[in-house]
Amino acid sequence: MRERFDSEYIRSELERISDHLETPLTVYLIGGGSMSFRNLKETTKDVDLVVTDGDALQQLQVVLLDCGYEVIKDPSEEYHELSAQRILENADGCRIDVFNQKVVDKLVLSEGMCDRSVTHLEAGELTVALVSTEDVFLFKSVAGRTDDIDDMFTLVQTGLDFDIVEAELEQQIDLLGRELFVSYVNEALMSLDERHNITTPLFNPVSKITQRVYRELEVFHAFDDAIPRSCNSERGIASSNA
């Protein structure tokens, strides 16, 4: 079983990272680390950091390597699904997942998310911002890891503004140009209902979008399956007329 780390440890690691920075770097803390700093979670296995561009990604990786972190070259299937650009771990077993704008290959760190975030730590050249609890809830809903549903339940207890969550969901659809990721949100909301008997105001709009996604997928697959048969039929007619 992997080690878990509290907010004090995470803060000390972030401050250690700041000691190695020579130019400004802003990172956005999502997931369990963000919840830990808000006293919503005692410990977490991973520190999920989002940066806004490739230069910041490279800068953070270099600093983490300087701090003794090593790149995890063969993460478990659970981590493959996260689609982090970099996964690094230190000697204590603290793992940092680094994302460049896109998280879990399903959500983008949007302008609205950045605007809603709050600065939690400023140390040297490092600025650490916590994304809002509403946005953490949305990230958790697509992450697909074991503890995420329980974390979503904890977040609901804080009195989330689901108008914000729904508006961000619509914004993500516009940014990504597709709705498929909403089906993952739907699965998470169903699990939340089954495990904790909690139905959020997000359930109905997400369910409607998911039904539309499934209908479109059915049409696509039906069309895709029909193409070989159509081609074979045309070839048969051609040969019979020869």
Segments predicted by a language model, with ranges:
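Compositionally biased terminal segments of proteins
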Residues: 1-242
